[in-house]
Amino acid sequence: MGGVTMKNNLKKYIKYILSVILVFFVGVNGMEVYALEESRDVYLSDLDWLNATHGDDTKSKIVQKNHPFTPGNNNQSTKISLKMEDGSISEFEKGLGTIAGSPSTITYDISGAGVTKFFSYLGIDRSANPINEQYAKVDKIEVVVDGKVIYSTINQFPNGLTYETPAIKVDLNIPENAKRLQLKSYAGEKTWGDEVVYADAKFTAKGDFVNPNDWTPAEKRREISNEKPLLMIPLYANGSKYEKGDYAFWGDDTLVGKWKEVPDDLKPYTVIQLHPDDLPKRDGVAADFYEHMLNEAQSYVNPKTNKNEPIPIVLTVYTAGNVPGYTAAHWLTTEWIEDMYSKYSALQGVFSTENYWVWTDNVESNAAEYLKLSAKYGGYFIWSEQNNGGSIEKAFGSNGKTVFKEAVEKYWENFIFMYKNTPQAEGNDAPTSSYMTGLWLTDYAYQWGGLMDTWKWYETGKWKLFESGNIGKTQGNRQWLTEPEALLGIEAMNIYLNGGCVYNFEHPAYTYGVRNEESPLFSNVIKEFFRYVINNPSPSKNEMRAKTKSLLYGNFTQNGNGNYFVGLNTEMSQSPAYTTGRYGNIPAVPSSIERNKIESRLSGSQIKLIDMNSSELSNITNRKEYFNKLYKEEYNGNIFAQKLDNRWFIYNYKYNENINQKGSFDIANIKSEVTLEPHTYLIMEDNNQSINIKLNNYRTNKDSLWEGAKNADEAKKLPEMSKVDALNWVYDSYIKNTNNGEKRTSVIKLMNIDKAPTITNVNGIEGSYDIPTVKYNSETRSAEITIKNNGNIDFDIVIK
C-alpha cells in the first residue's frame, strides 16, 4: 500500500530531524548524554520464525511469506489482498499467509530485539473460495506474547471472521523485555478457505533480532549410553490435593523423599520424571506445579555432603495428544519450557508419552520443537510410544508431516525413543521394539529403551494369575497390581540384550513404591536388574551393528503389525516376551524415511536392507528360512535364550500359563540343560573355572485381590477398587505385609563332567532361597543343580 509506505518514510524523516536537533543541543550546552537507540520497522516476512504450523490437510505445505497460503504453495506470485473498511481491495507486498487450524501458530523470537510495537492488517485473503457459509470462516485470531493473549478478534467479532469481514487493523504495544510473539488463528467448522493473512505485519524494534537457526547444540547436561544407563522414576501429581494448595503426588511420595530412597550407587544413573496426571485442566496449573518442583529440585542439599546437589528432573510435557480435556500439559508452551531449561540445571530433559490413542495435528510439530529446545540447552527429548495406529510411522512422516523427522536428522544425539507396551489392540509389542532398534542403529535415535507397563494386564483382560477367561477392563486397579514381578525383569532383559539403555516402569506405585518406600517389585527385581546393567554395560551401537545382518524397511501397519513376527520369534501378536533370541530384536525402519538415507547410514556395515514385503519375507515360512540362513542356531529347546559374549540369557516366555520350559546350551565347553518355571530369568556366565549363575523368579501371591471370584464372570462383578484403595493396598498389604510366594524350583544339568561341581559364593535376600543342591551321577558323568528360591540369587558353580 503506497499510503502506508509514505507514512513510514515520514516517521523515519522526523526521527532523523529530532536526532540532529538533539546533537546540536548537546554541542551547544556541553552536556554529556548517551546515544539513543533508533527504532525501526522490521517486516515479519523478512525474519525467520521459530516455528510455523497450519491447518491444511497436506502437511508438506508450508506457511507462506508475502503470499497467501494456497497460491504460494502452488508457486503462484499472487500478492496478499484484503477487503478494506471502505469496500476497496488492497494488495500488500509484505505479510504472512497460513490456514487456520486448532490453532495454527506462527512463533517469533523477539528476545533482546527491543520490540515496542506490532502492526498488521488481519483477515481472510481474497484468494479464498467461500463456496458455502462454512468455508472461509475463522473463529478468531490472537496475538500472544510470552503466553498471554494481548489481542483477540473475538472481542470485536464474537461470531468469528468471514470472507466479507473487512481487514482488521491492529497496532499493539508490546511489553518491555518480551521474548516470544505468536500469531494464532483458530479454524471454524471447516478449514477449507480459511486463508488467514497477516498483511503488512511488522515490528517496531530498537535492537537486532536473533536468528532462531543460528545456534549449535549445547554440551549435554548428562551422558546417557550403554555405560551410563538411565532409570526413570515417575511421580504423578495429585490434582485434588493441588486444588487445596498442596503440591503433592499420588501415593504420598515427596520429591526429596523419593530421591533419598534411591540407593546411592544408582543415583548417578537415575532421574525423577514428573507427570501432570489429574492436575486441574486449565492454563497455568501444570507450569505452576512443575516450577514449584523444579525449585525444590534445584535447591536440594545432600544431607550426607551438606552440598547443593540438584535432583535431576525430566518433565512430562506432552501426553494424550495434549488434548485439553485429558491433560494439564496442554497449556505448557515451548516458551515456558525454554525458560525452565534456562533457569534450572536440574532439568535434564522433557518427556512425551502415550499419544497413539489420540494422535492430534500438532504431535509431530511439537515433538520437533521439544527436540530442538533440548538440543539447544543440552537436554534430551525422550519419547515413549507404541506403534498402534502407525504412530511411529506417523512420527517420521507417513502422513506427510516431516517436521519431526527433519529435526531428528539434525539433532538425533538429543533424542531417545522408548516403547510403551501398554495396549492390546493391533499387537504391536514386537514391531515397536523393532522400530526402536532400527531407528537407533541408523542414527535416528541416540539411545533407545522401554516403558514396561503393568497396565497391560488390564488392557488384555487378565485377572488372577494363570486363570482363564477374559474380564475386559472391568477391574483396572486390581489388574495392574497382578502382573508377576519377575516378568518386568524379563521385559527389561529384552532391552538390555539389544543395546537399549533407558528403563521406565508403570504402574509407579506397584513398580517403585509409595510413601517414599520401595515396593517389593523394585527391591527384588528392578533394583537388582539395573545394578547388573550398570556393572555390565549392554552392547554398544557399534557392537550391535557388527552382529546385525539384516534390517527391515517398510511399515508394519501394511504388513500385519504384530502378526508379522508370530511363529518367527513371538508366540502371539501381543506379547511382552519373545520365544527365541536367535535373531536378536530384528530391527526395522519405516518407509517414510528415504531409503537412500538409510543405506547411507548403513554403509560400511554388513547389514542388508530388505523390504518387509519382499518375496523372501512374504510368509512365515519364507521369513524363517531367510533369518535362519543369517543367524545360526546356538541352542535347542522350547525356551527363550540369547547368547552375548560368554553369557547366556535365558527365560521362560509363558507369562500367564503355568508351563515349565527347557533348553540345552553349550557353556564352558560343557553341555548344559536348563529347566525354568514361568516368571524366571537366568544369566549363566562362563568364568573358565566356574559358571556364575544369576537367577530371579520373584513373585508374590496376590490372590487376595481376587477373593470371592472363582471364574472370570465372577471377577468382573467384584466391587471395583478405587485408586486410593489401590494405593493404600500397596502400602498396607504389599509393602508392609508382603505375601511372598512359595519358593519355586529351577534345575541346571551339566553333562560330561568328571566330578561333582561345588556351589560357592551364594548371595541373595535372607530367607528367599535354599542353598542350591548338587546331585552327581558318576555313571552318566552328569550333575543336577537344584535351586529353590523366590527372588534374586547369585552363586558360582565351580566345575574345575
Swiss-Prot record:
Residues 1-35 form the signal peptide. SMART domains: NPCBM. SUPFAM superfamilies: Galactose-binding domain-like. GO terms for cellular component: extracellular region. One of its GO terms (biological process) is carbohydrate metabolic process. It catalyses: Endohydrolysis of (1->4)-beta-D-galactosidic linkages in blood group A and B substances. Its main location: secreted. Keywords: Carbohydrate metabolism, Glycosidase, Hydrolase, Secreted, Signal. It is found in: Secreted. Its EC number is 3.2.1.102. InterPro entries: Galactose-bd-like_sf, GH98_C, GH98_central, Glyco_hyd_98_carb-bd, Lyase_8-like_C, NPCBM_sf. It holds the Pfam family NPCBM. GO terms for molecular function: blood-group-substance endo-1,4-beta-galactosidase activity. Belongs to the glycosyl hydrolase 98 family. Endo-beta-galactosidase capable of releasing both the blood group A trisaccharide (A-Tri; GalNAcalpha1-->3(Fucalpha1-->2)Gal) and B trisaccharide (B-Tri; Galalpha1-->3(Fucalpha1-->2)Gal) glycotopes from blood group A- and B-containing glycoconjugates, respectively. This is Blood-group-substance endo-1,4-beta-galactosidase. It comes from Clostridium perfringens.
